């Protein structure tokens, strides 16, 4: 008997955070997808302006991407936990899954701050 969408959602709602993380990992493996792809940045508001010189506009939102953890993996995991608020296991999974998005849609100042903290810990970071 197939479970309905509502039954599945109710089952997920009753799971602990760790069970949900394990479920997501199992779904990623089974279907060959990543959860990070589902969290794509939304398009910027007010985007259909048609002003000329649009390519010359200064970028206001940045995605912070962890490219590599370098030689200090433990330090980078601590830094990722500090800037994201993730738990130890989740931060470790992010660091081991390089390249991985750390923060999407961040302001220039916030993105530079996160980049500095991660690079101080030994990571390679890109701003997009």
Curated annotation (Swiss-Prot):
It comes from the Bacteria. Keywords: Ribonucleoprotein, Ribosomal protein. Forms part of the ribosomal stalk which helps the ribosome interact with GTP-bound translation factors. Is thus essential for accurate translation. One of its GO terms (cellular component) is cytosolic large ribosomal subunit. Belongs to the bacterial ribosomal protein bL12 family. NCBIfam families: L12. It comes from Halorhodospira halophila (strain DSM 244 / SL1). Homodimer. Part of the ribosomal stalk of the 50S ribosomal subunit. Forms a multimeric L10(L12)X complex, where L10 forms an elongated spine to which 2 to 4 L12 dimers bind in a sequential fashion. Binds GTP-bound translation factors. This is Large ribosomal subunit protein bL12. Pfam families: Ribosomal_L12, Ribosomal_L12_N.
